[in-house]
Every structure is written in structure tokens, then in C-alpha cells.
């Protein structure tokens, strides 16, 4: 079962909805893309809200608005932020809003319960299934939260591939056995807290390190410069917010050289322990 929200309503002027979304996105630092039949609001690298519209045949010339979001693997923090965005639209531009929230958070906005009673058990079940698959085929590999239309990383037997890193069966199994669901959710969900804390920025960097980065000089292309810069900015922001949070310091230093940027992390920042070097 996927966790998320679907919603619908009507409006008199779809352009007002577009402007309202753009205004809210600017206030929150989200990215927005719009086209003729809809738009997408990107709240984080693995989480977005889609909206679409079609004209309603009536004398008043109204528009039907539909939308949705899938909240995994982004995490409970994303779900909360998406719910707030959807609620705000229902209070302003979209009339007669109806929604269905698979987590019931919109009906009972208790974030800690959302995380503990919905997202963590869901993650445990996904990991349990992944490990059972590896037990049946120890030489196999499981891609978890991975878009099947996306490239396939080089195979490493006995591992689980995720957007924020590769993990061995042993590493995941040990934590599942001792019930360390909070540790697992903090590591595998990109956005696990209500706001943008240090771990959120670190996980955004990890997602781009593992999934998007070519580890190429920034002057090779505009894409390399953008990706390298985003990763470095996120890691430096994370260190400013929590100097004790482990970061991928070795990868950071490598990218600083590739980006021709001076080292900006404190020397005593702890190294994030990873079984495999970042990069698919």
C-alpha cells in the first residue's frame, strides 16, 4: 500500500490557483512547474504534489481541479507539508475540496502518531519483504523505492538499493531485529521530521550523491555544476544546523575539489559510516 493523498474540488479561475500555488511555493522554497493541463510542486527531491484541471461544462465556466501526492519514500515530514499545502488551497482558491488521506493525518494532524503508527510500520514491512527476497536469492539485489523506468545501478549481490544509499542485508536485518525503526526511518526517509532540520539537508545531499551525481568537474557541464553545488550547499547547511550529525565528509571533500570550492565544513565533523561508497 502506498501512503499519500488524493483530492479534488472546483474553481472559477484556474489561473488564480496557479498564482496561489506559486506564491505559497515561493514562501516555502518549493519548486514549481506548470503546463497547459496542470502543474507540479516539488517539495523535496523525492516528494511532489501534482495538480490537474479540466473545464466543467456549465454556464458559469468553472474548472475541476484534481491532485495527488505519494508520500513515500519522502517520509512523514513531506506528508505533513503536502497536507498543509493542500489544506491551504482548499481554504483559498479551490472550493468544495474533498480529499482522501490514506494516513488519516488530515483528519487527525498528530505528527508523532503519523510517524510512529503509520510510516515506521510501513517501512518495516517494506524492508521485511526486501530481506525475504534476498533470503530466497542471496546473489540477488532488491531495488526499494526505485522507479522502474529509471536506470538500473550496477548489481551488487545481497544488497538493497534505495535513493539515499545501498545497504547490505546484514545492516538492515540487524536493525530490524532489534526494532530500531526510528534509526531506519531517519536513514531511509528523506524527510522524517516536521521541518527542515540538519538530517533533512543531509539526506537531500545523499539522494543527489547516490542517484544524480556524476562525480565530474563542475566545469564539464552546467548540469555537473548545478548538482555538485546543490550537494555541497546542503551538506554545509546541515553542518551549520547540527555540527555533531555525521556527514559524508570524504565525498564532500572530493566534490569541493571538483567544484573548485574551498572546504567549508568544520574539521571535527564526524564521517557518516557507509558500507558502500556513494554513487550508482
Kindly label every feature range from the protein language model.
Residues 1-280:
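Acidic (Asp/Glu-rich) sequence patches and key acidic residues
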Amino acid at each position: 500500500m502506498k501512503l499519500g493523498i488524493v483530492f479534488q474540488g472546483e474553481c472559477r479561475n484556474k489561473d488564480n490557483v496557479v498564482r496561489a500555488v506559486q506564491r505559497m511555493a515561493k514562501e516555502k522554497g518549493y519548486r514549481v512547474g506548470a503546463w497547459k493541463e496542470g502543474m507540479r510542486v516539488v517539495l523535496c527531491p523525492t516528494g511532489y504534489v501534482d495538480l490537474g484541471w479540466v473545464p466543467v461544462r456549465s454556464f458559469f465556466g468553472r474548472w475541476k481541479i484534481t491532485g495527488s501526492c505519494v508520500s513515500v519514500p519522502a517520509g512523514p515530514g513531506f506528508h505533513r507539508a503536502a497536507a498543509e499545502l493542500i489544506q491551504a488551497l482548499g481554504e483559498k482558491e479551490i472550493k468544495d475540496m474533498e480529499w482522501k488521506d490514506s494516513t488519516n493525518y488530515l483528519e487527525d494532524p498528530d505528527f508523532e502518531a503519523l510517524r510512529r503508527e503509520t510510516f515506521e510500520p510501513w517501512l518495516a514491512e517494506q524492508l521485511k519483504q526486501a530481506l525475504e527476497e534476498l533470503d530466497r536469492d542471496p546473489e540477488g539485489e532488491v531495488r526499494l523505492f526505485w522507479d522502474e523506468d529509471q536506470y538500473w545501478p550496477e548489481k551488487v549481490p545481497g544488497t538493497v538499493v534505495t535513493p539515499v544509499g545501498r545497504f547490505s542485508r546484514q545492516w538492515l536485518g540487524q536493525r530490524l531485529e532489534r526494532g530500531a525503526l526510528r534509526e531506519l526511518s531517519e536513514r531511509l526517509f528523506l524527510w522524517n521530521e516536521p521541518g527542515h532540520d540538519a538530517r533533512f539537508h543531509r539526506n537531500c545531499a545523499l539522494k543527489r550523491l547516490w542517484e544524480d551525481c556524476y562525480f565530474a568537474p563542475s566545469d564539464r557541464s552546467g548540469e555537473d555544476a548545478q548538482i555538485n553545488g546543490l550537494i555541497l550547499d546542503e551538506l554545509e547547511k546541515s553542518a551549520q544546523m547540527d555540527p555533531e550529525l555525521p556527514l559524508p565528509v570524504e565525498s564532500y571533500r572530493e566534490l569541493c575539489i571538483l567544484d573548485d570550492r574551498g572546504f567549508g565544513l568544520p574539521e571535527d565533523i564526524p564521517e557518516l559510516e557507509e558500507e558502500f561508497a556513494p554513487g550508482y
